[in-house]
Amino acid sequence: MSNYFDTLNLREQLDQLGRCRFMDREEFSTEADYLKGKRVVIVGCGAQGLNQGLNMRDSGLNVAYALRQAAIDEQRQSFKNASENGFEVASYEKLIPQADLVINLTPDKQHTNVVETVMPLMKEGATLGYSHGFNIVEEGMKIRKDLTVVMVAPKCPGTEVREEYKRGFGVPTLIAVHPENDPKGEGWDIAKAWAAGTGGHRAGCLESSFVAEVKSDLMGEQTILCGMLQAGSIVCYEKMIADGIDASYAGKLLQFGWETVTEALKFGGVTHMMDRLSNPAKIKAFDLSEELKDLMRPLYNKHMDDIISGHFSSTMMADWANDDVNLLGWREETGETAFENYPDSSLEIPEQEYFDNGILMVAMVRAGVELAFEAMTASGIVDESAYYESLHELPLIANTVARKRLYEMNVVISDTAEYGNYLFANVATPLLREKFMPLVDTDVIGRGLGAISNQVDNAKLIEVNETIRNHPVEYIGEELRGYMTDMKTIAVGG
């Protein structure tokens, strides 16, 4: 197999990268009806598999789970997830031939083997579904020409897919149809019905492409979503400990601080997050973030270049073939970092203190969001995709750090995201440690600016505010958050 993206000419590549349209709620007026009366079989029952299946069943769809016979015989966790929730569970051979829609929700590294196994069992004219297009775009999987291939990609971990559905809402979702596999012209009808079955239409769906989803998803998760949180946690903790700050306080400020500052980001973008700081702290955070952007821009651009060229994917797949020796080694090293092992305590930090004493964290978030967004849009990815894969998902990932530090983040994200995270953090951590952290003090991480005057230069403050608010990520963010608010009003009202 060869990388699908590389088989496209430049015009086709740019067209696929630039596919992203926010879909009107009226386009989902029939909700999941197109799939009602049809047989949906999900392969794999991890977080995405189970929670998408629960939502689809509650939306009136007929859902079953196909697992390997060994997983059934040994009653592995995937079998327990499905059977304990009352789903029919059976082997590939029993369920796949009956399926109208087969949804592959196994880990990325298993996709080739799974698809090569299930494809001969699928009936003529059936549909194969993905929630991440890596297998199609990066591995170049060729699908039988009579099969339709679609994607529904919720922009959050599987647990949130379920929780938002139970609240009567959903999560923003990218949907796509593989242009090489839509023989009956029904791909979009199937994708829309599947998305509606998960509740995604209530939060807003983006009409995208397999290429745009994969390239933007890889970039976001490697850099701002995971890599920057990991590198930032490690170097900020080291700084505070070296300067005499209590280990429990330093660890808690970081573990729960990322979640707190990005919660502000979720509601009002970078502008609102920065507005949570005092005026002197805002100017300080702005200056720090500008320095960080200058320092880290080459690294962000390298990751984007390696994703576009396919170098990242080929490197990771080589590690798959080598029994994940690099991935597992980096995972172990992360578990041994000082931040991961800081002592627990009953200490409580007031919400505003996370901002006041975490000025550098705010600066890192602003720098990381803007750098990731800029790298993506400069490569042909449109603003909407870049927003969802940078700013929008960051609070969701920060929440996993709050639960169980970096370990939880790396468990919840895919192996693909985890591998990319380590690639980024392994370079970003020493870069920050050597070139940036010696230039800052605990007034920006750990202790705060203290009892200083709030007086600032008015012209400087105006310049800072205008620069923050006029970044393209703020314009598209305000527009998309507005759509989501409107969608939620309609969903709740309905």
Curated annotation (Swiss-Prot):
EC numbers for this chain: 1.1.1.86
Binding site for substrate: S414
The entry's keywords: Amino-acid biosynthesis, Branched-chain amino acid biosynthesis, Magnesium, Metal-binding, NADP, Oxidoreductase, Repeat
Any one GO molecular-function label of the UniProt entry: magnesium ion binding
Residues annotated as domain KARI C-terminal knotted: 209-344, 345-487
Annotated metabolic or biological route of this protein: Amino-acid biosynthesis; L-isoleucine biosynthesis; L-isoleucine from 2-oxobutanoate: step 2/4; Amino-acid biosynthesis; L-valine biosynthesis; L-valine from pyruvate: step 2/4
Cofactor note: Binds 2 magnesium ions per subunit.
Binding residues annotated for Mg(2+) 1, in chain numbering: D217, E221
Catalytic activity: (2R)-2,3-dihydroxy-3-methylbutanoate + NADP(+) = (2S)-2-acetolactate + NADPH + H(+); (2R,3R)-2,3-dihydroxy-3-methylpentanoate + NADP(+) = (S)-2-ethyl-2-hydroxy-3-oxobutanoate + NADPH + H(+)
Keyword Amino-acid biosynthesis belongs to the record: yes
Keyword hit for Oxidoreductase: yes
Annotated residues for binding of Mg(2+) 2: D217, E389, E393
Principal EC category: oxidoreductase
Segments forming domain KARI N-terminal Rossmann: 14-208
Function: Involved in the biosynthesis of branched-chain amino acids (BCAA). Catalyzes an alkyl-migration followed by a ketol-acid reduction of (S)-2-acetolactate (S2AL) to yield (R)-2,3-dihydroxy-isovalerate. In the isomerase reaction, S2AL is rearranged via a Mg-dependent methyl migration to produce 3-hydroxy-3-methyl-2-ketobutyrate (HMKB). In the reductase reaction, this 2-ketoacid undergoes a metal-dependent reduction by NADPH to yield (R)-2,3-dihydroxy-isovalerate.
Protein name stated in the entry: Ketol-acid reductoisomerase (NADP(+))
